[in-house]
From Swiss-Prot:
The keyword Nucleotide-binding does not apply. Keywords: Ribonucleoprotein, Ribosomal protein, RNA-binding, rRNA-binding. The gene is rplR. This is Large ribosomal subunit protein uL18. CDD domains: Ribosomal_L18_L5e. One of its GO terms (biological process) is translation. Part of the 50S ribosomal subunit; part of the 5S rRNA/L5/L18/L25 subcomplex. Contacts the 5S and 23S rRNAs. This is one of the proteins that bind and probably mediate the attachment of the 5S RNA into the large ribosomal subunit, where it forms part of the central protuberance.
């Protein structure tokens, strides 16, 4: 089993446990250059809010700061944006789905920023 398969196996187990809870899910995906966050409905079929470093507004802000989307500063910005969008959609509490990634670096920065912006998990 290689690194990617192990990550996907961990993600699958987490998603099964979150589905049993029947709560909204904040899913995070990261690549070398970008980070993405989505809030899914409790049934898991609808995306209620999303934010990523591909959005034009985010890219403009990042160009002023660092010029890149694959760093902790970008993850912090995405964490704040996803919390604001989730609250606007009426979501106060979510389950955090790190998609099998270690809770470290960019994933941790996104989670901490979302918590500071008022999202509970």
């Amino acid at each position: 089993m290689d690194k990617t398969q192990s990550r996907l196996r961990r993600a699958r187990q987490t998603r099964i446990k979150i589905a049993e809870l029947q709560v909204a899910r904040l899913a995070v995906h990261r690549t070398n250059t970008h980070i993405y966050a989505q809030v899914f409905s409790p049934c898991g079929t609808k995306v209620l809010a999303s934010a990523s470093t591909l959005e034009a507004e985010v890219r403009a802000q990042l160009a002023d700061q660092t010029g890149k989307g694959g760093n902790v500063a970008a993850a912090t910005l995405i964490g704040k944006r996803i919390a604001e969008k989730a609250k606007a959609a009426g979501i106060e509490s979510v389950a955090f789905d790190r998609s099998g990634f270690r809770y470290h670096g960019r994933v941790k920065a996104l989670a901490d920023a979302a918590r500071e912006a008022g999202l509970k998990f």
